[in-house]
Amino acid sequence: RRGGRVVVKQAQDLKQGDKLIKFELPIIEGTEVFNSAYTNGFYSGDGCFYKGKGFVYLYHDKQKLLDRMQNVKKVHTDENQNRQTVYFKEGTLKDKYFVPLDNYTIKSRLEWLAGICDSDGTVSRNGLNESLQISSTQLTFLQEIQLMLQTLGVTSTINEACEEGWRDMPLNDGSGETGKFFCQKAYRLLINSNSLFKLSELGFE
């Protein structure tokens, strides 16, 4: 938009001072059902794969989420670390960074999103407004999630969360101590309050 007039331009023809008109993304319904969508979403955020076995750790309050997990093979409880290790049946998990797109039903995509948000999401509050952040060292993975959100009619943004470098992190051995670990560069995907409201109208919880 320039001077009150609407002009159609290609991206490479945009100039400083041009303003983009607001638009609504369409909501696309797919037909394929993702039977273990929540579990795969959680696995994408906090899952591990070792010697042919996929599993996740549930610490503290997150152990309440065990009832939402599907295709569980066995659960190992470590009371010293207040942790459950949940192992899944072979062949029931997609690749760790798989993201369901518009060929899957809206319900399947929302359940997958709930899974990764429960494992790797952070809610930020500013007064009455809430926003949701998903962090990852895998930029392409976050871009795939951003694309999935667009198929649900929702916009989001991606920015840098932190640079790579050495940081103090928990040793994860039950001691409560920390140690120096080299961390990769991290990114975060941000979903603002308006977009969260749209997702809630679709059934996201």
State the predicted function of each range.
Residues 1-205:
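Internal intein/HINT superfamily modules and their associated LAGLIDADG
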